[in-house]
């Protein structure tokens, strides 16, 4: 079988499964968030936590709950890491250092899962499931809750601007969606040989004749939510390149499907919730809105996948010519198709899991996965974050389109006034500011040069790739992705602190702006579409929104990309 045919079959299979799951999964999630019925165990949980599930929150109440819950999560996870040495299942591991504990706590609570440590030798078999795996569930549920709150802003007409109850949305997202789906995925992964054990490890003899200690852990259960919740942090240092996490081509496809399932299906959830089920025309219109967003995601995802496949299938250099492709840093069991498909999916979402060494990608392939993040991770984006990210860009596209043709800027019957556009613009500007400022300061500081695996005189190949590594790190942290170019050493206090702050601001500033936007929209009355209303469903708006996404990224990041991946590719 040729590589091109293998790539085509894998992509076709992934798209076919997602197409089959799109309607039932999307509609199920809409029912979960729209249901007025609380399950018995949910009611018990609300009573224990003294939560009134029938209370609606304004945007600032909702945002306060998000920030309060996330702050408590950071403190708990930080404390758990610091004292893990005196807790059960720690083996001979001691407590985690303050800088690493801070960075890791922030990383997992923000759904980034950036890992500046070796999991096997740092985190115990208690810290992994009780601390990190729990955050894999709830951090994903937070993103989904914010997306649903924004959808309610378009749907509701409320004088007070109520957008739901965060605690109810968090509970339902965790227990009704993420937990059962993860259970099924974990069973499938177990059938493929993914390990599940609390044993500390076993010794074996390596190929060089020396004794090697092989770490064991409850991998399958954490691997499932790692991918489904677009978290990405591996329980083993090699992440999904490790045979204990991702042993077969089948498990590789399962993990890719888990990464894409919820972000893709949330566009159906959006379409279902904004349509009126009692009005056939409104229901169809809502679904067309969702399909339009999905089309934009698909165009961007497919384009970058094609670029990555072409770049990695090339034969640049002696080694690539001998191997038949750019196989450095890749697993033979996945090949170029499985590697490229995984890389584009993990950077197009906020997952950040890897089944190859991204630092070993070709300049064009590495640039493609970097661009995937710099687009704002909306192709198709993380669980929740991708949907509210592309909706914010849709508002900007409507505003720009209205200015171009003199039409009224409206979206789903809600007027886009100065307040709405300001909030949308602020949300979009957070990530570029963090990436460019963080990268600029880092490359200027002389103290950080020694941490770059690639360096040299200005303009040399080493310095160009070293710049790409720094740019990738801050793009990953600010977008809550978590993947990295491994040539950059990020264990210093500067990187631990700077990247930790980028993760915090990159996660919660957009959330605050999006929730404020939801509250502002919810307080408006709906207006009927007229002759001057720009259509927001169909091919024309798909092109406008795609162009807006690309234009925003190009204007913002082209100079930085020209200094890094583009310059490297032209050498």
From Swiss-Prot:
Leader sequence segment: none
Subcellular location as annotated: Cell membrane
GO MF, any single term: potassium ion binding
Bilayer disposition of the protein: Multi-pass membrane protein
Disulfide bonds: none
Function: Part of the high-affinity ATP-driven potassium transport (or Kdp) system, which catalyzes the hydrolysis of ATP coupled with the electrogenic transport of potassium into the cytoplasm. This subunit binds the extracellular potassium ions and delivers the ions to the membrane domain of KdpB through an intramembrane tunnel.
HAMAP family (UniProt xref): KdpA
Family: Belongs to the KdpA family.
Protein name per its UniProtKB record: Potassium-transporting ATPase potassium-binding subunit
Gene: kdpA
């Amino acid at each position: 079988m040729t590589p091109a045919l293998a790539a085509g079959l894998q992509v076709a299979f992934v798209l076919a499964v997602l197409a089959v799951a799109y309607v039932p999964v999307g509609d199920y999630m809409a029912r979960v968030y729209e249901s007025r019925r609380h399950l018995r165990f949910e009611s018990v949980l609300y009573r224990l936590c003294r939560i009134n599930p029938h209370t609606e929150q304004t945007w600032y109440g909702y945002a306060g709950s998000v920030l309060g819950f996330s702050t408590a999560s950071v403190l708990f996870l930080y404390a758990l890491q610091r004292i893990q040495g005196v807790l059960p299942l720690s083996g001979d591991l001691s407590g985690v250092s303050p800088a690493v504990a801070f960075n890791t706590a922030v990383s997992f609570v923000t759904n980034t899962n950036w890992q500046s440590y070796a999991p096997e030798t740092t985190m115990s078999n208690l810290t992994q499931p009780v601390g990190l795996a729990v955050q894999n569930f709830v951090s994903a549920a937070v993103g989904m809750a914010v997306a649903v709150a924004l959808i309610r802003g378009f749907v509701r007409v409320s004088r007070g601007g109520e957008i739901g109850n965060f605690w109810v949305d968090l509970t339902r997202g965790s227990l009704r969606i993420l937990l059962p789906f993860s259970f099924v995925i974990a069973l499938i992964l177990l059938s493929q040989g993914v390990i599940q054990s609390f044993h500390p490890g076993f010794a074996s003899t390596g190929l060089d004749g020396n004794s090697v200690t092989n770490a064991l852990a409850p991998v399958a259960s954490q691997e499932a939510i790692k991918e489904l919740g677009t978290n990405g942090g591996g329980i083993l240092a090699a992440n999904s390149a490790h045979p204990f996490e991702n042993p077969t081509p089948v498990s590789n496809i399962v993990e890719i499907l888990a990464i894409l399932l919820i972000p893709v299906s949330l566009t159906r959830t959006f379409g279902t919730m904004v349509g009126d089920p009692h009005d056939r025309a409104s229901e169809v219109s809502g679904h067309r809105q969702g399909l339009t967003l999905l089309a934009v995601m698909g165009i961007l995802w497919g384009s970058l996948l094609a670029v990555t496949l072409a770049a990695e299938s090339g034969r640049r250099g002696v080694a690539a010519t001998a191997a038949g492709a750019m196989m450095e840093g890749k697993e033979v069991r996945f090949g170029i198709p499985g590697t490229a498909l995984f890389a584009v999916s993990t950077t197009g979402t906020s997952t950040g899991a890897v089944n190859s060494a991204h630092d070993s990608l070709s300049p064009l392939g590495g640039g493609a996965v970097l661009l995937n993040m710099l687009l704002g991770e909306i192709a198709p984006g993380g669980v929740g974050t991708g949907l509210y990210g592309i909706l914010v860009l849709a508002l900007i596209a409507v505003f720009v389109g209205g200015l171009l043709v003199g039409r009224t800027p409206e979206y789903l019957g809600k007027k886009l006034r100065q307040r709405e556009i300001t909030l949308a613009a602020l949300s979009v500007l957070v990530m570029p500011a963090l990436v460019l400022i963080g990268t600029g300061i880092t490359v200027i500081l002389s103290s950080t040069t020694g941490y770059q695996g690639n360096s040299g005189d200005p303009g040399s190949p080493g310095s160009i790739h070293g710049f790409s590594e720094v740019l990738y790190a801050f793009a990953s942290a600010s977008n809550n992705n978590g993947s990295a170019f491994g040539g950059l050493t990020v264990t210093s206090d500067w990187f631990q602190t700077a990247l930790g702050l980028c993760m915090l601001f990159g996660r919660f500033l957009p959330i605050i702006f999006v929730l404020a936007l939801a509250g502002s929209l919810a307080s408006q009355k709906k207006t009927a579409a007229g002759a001057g209303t720009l259509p927001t469903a169909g091919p024309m708006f798909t092109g406008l929104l795609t162009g807006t996404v690309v234009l925003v990224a190009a204007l913002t990041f082209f100079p930085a990309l020209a200094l890094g991946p583009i310059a490297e590719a032209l050498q």
